[in-house]
Amino acid sequence: MAQTRAWKSIMPLESLPGWLNAVVWGLLLLFCQVQGQDSASPIRNTHTGQVRGSFVHVKDTKSGVHTFLGIPFAKPPIGPLRFAPPEPPEPWSGVRDGTSHPAMCLQNIDGLNLENLKIKMSRSPVSMSEDCLYLSIYTPAHTHKDSNLPVMVWIHGGGLCWGMASTYDGSMLAAIEDVVVVTIQYRLGILGFFSTGDEHARGNWGYLDQVAALRWVQQNIVHFGGNPDRVTIFGESAGGISVSSHVVSPMSQGLFHGAIMESGVALLPNLISNTSEVIYTMVANLSGCEPVDSEALMSCLREKSEEEMLAINNIVRTISGVVDGKFLPRHPLELLASVDFHPVPSIIGINSDEYGWIIPMLHPDSTMKEINRETMRAVLKNTAVQMMLPPECSDLLMEEYMGDTEDSKTLQIQFNEMMGDFIFVIPALQVAHFQRSHAPVYFYEFQHQSNFLKDIRPPHVKADHGDELPYVIGYLFWDMKFVFTEEEKLLSRKMIKYWANFARHGNPNSEGLPYWPALDHDEQYLQLDIQPVVGRALKARRLKFWTKTLPQKIQELKGSQDNHTEL
């Protein structure tokens, strides 16, 4: 209306010729209509066509967000594109609807053992399909092409076998911190990571999907108010492993400028492999393809229906990325040790009880219920073999973690701490130490015991695997609602501010927040709780045990075995 008043001050509308009067009012009405349409049903350009989003008011804020859901960043990976690198999406005519979530990638939802979690969850209404290479964008409603806001690209977790973009709502993060949030999907399980170990199927299809999504962001995010030169990738668990893998991959160079790894790095055991033989043999047997060679097997697998592929996927419960010579030229440990990675600022962190409750509940072991020292020795021998350690190392594990305790409950708790250290904590500290000499690393341990979980889990579990997620990103797990206390709301705002500051400047600190020092030789890190405080030398004794004591013992065992062989 200000524009109307300005026009009237120049020339009264009634003094204009009739036809011109009509044109002016028509333009004003059109202007108002376009403005309204842009707010409620925004339309943005991409390099393949236009997309229409929707306006969302974010609770507890004065801000609104425009959401654009299910934008294709690659062709559907079906037919000849099954087990193939993603290809650019086809252009479309007209305006594409971006107001509903895309189908999740093929996965074994029933394999999650959700009934063990004692949490009431409603099944996701999201459908499932191989045609799943889509991303969603959450951008502050005031943005325009020149807004140049920092971009945060979220990569979901789920062991490379489960997960979907629609579980994570970026609206809160976008509204509170004035950033553009992108959530992406990638192929999972067999369809995402199966490899023949040769040129017929190199594998890492899911990682290549993520690269394609990051390339799409570089091409298009400016139309959604984002700055392609200020992209931070962040993820949790397998999402953190993905982020860490992009840091060492030559294919991802230049596609991002900061990295956040929550409870997952590329050195996590069993999620990066030098070989694919075990899974190759299993899939070949399950498929009924009777392959003469890998080329024939891949040809046969591409002919299988979606239902047949899902049936195979449901039996092969775990799968890893592979050293394929392309996305991962060498094992991440070698790439990190030889400083063959992108020196970008990073936040790396873990939770205080990574193996505290949810992972053991998803993979229940009846032998742990009535454990004693004798049965624990047998469990540790078996565990050592699974860790690819000599069985003789089980005595060292017993001494380091169990001490002389006889109590069954304490033995269980200590076993879970050992597993959390082996799988999550030690790899995270190792990656942080490799990277800190070449770019700033900010390390954290999330320690808060969430009030809404205290009646569900054992009291000794403080911050379990995934517990930081509701505090960092608007998070909805299959319609499970989280109710924060007032203190927890403040903690969430602090964590969101740290993460967004990092996305904006490569440094999480700002006025009003407890200072978070970079990890240096003083080994300082941030303990994230209701009142964040700086800690020093996180798990230093355990780190020494896993990286010095155990390897030394293994070398001694190997030496004695070699001497015995010579005799």
UniProtKB/Swiss-Prot annotation:
Signal sequence annotation: 1-36
Catalytic machinery residues: S237 (acyl-ester intermediate), E354 (charge relay system), H465 (charge relay system)
GO cellular component labels: endoplasmic reticulum; intracellular membrane-bounded organelle
Class in the EC hierarchy, top level: hydrolase
Keywords noted in UniProt: Disulfide bond, Endoplasmic reticulum, Hydrolase, Microsome, Pyrrolidone carboxylic acid, Signal
Enzyme Commission number, as recorded: 3.1.1.88, 3.1.1.-
PTM annotation (Pyrrolidone carboxylic acid): residues: Q37
Tissue/organ expression: Expressed in liver.
Molecular-function GO terms, alphabetical: all-trans-retinyl-palmitate hydrolase, all-trans-retinol forming activity; carboxylesterase activity; carboxylic ester hydrolase activity; retinyl-palmitate esterase activity; trans-permethrin hydrolase activity
Compartment(s) where it occurs, according to its Swiss-Prot or TrEMBL record: Microsome
Record's keyword annotation contains Manganese: no
Main location: other
Primary role: Carboxylesterase that catalyzes the hydrolysis of pyrethroids pesticides. Hydrolyzes trans-permethrin at a rate about 22-fold higher than cis-permethrin. Also hydrolyzes trans-cypermethrin. Hydrolyzes retinyl esters.
Name by which UniProt lists this protein: Pyrethroid hydrolase Ces2e
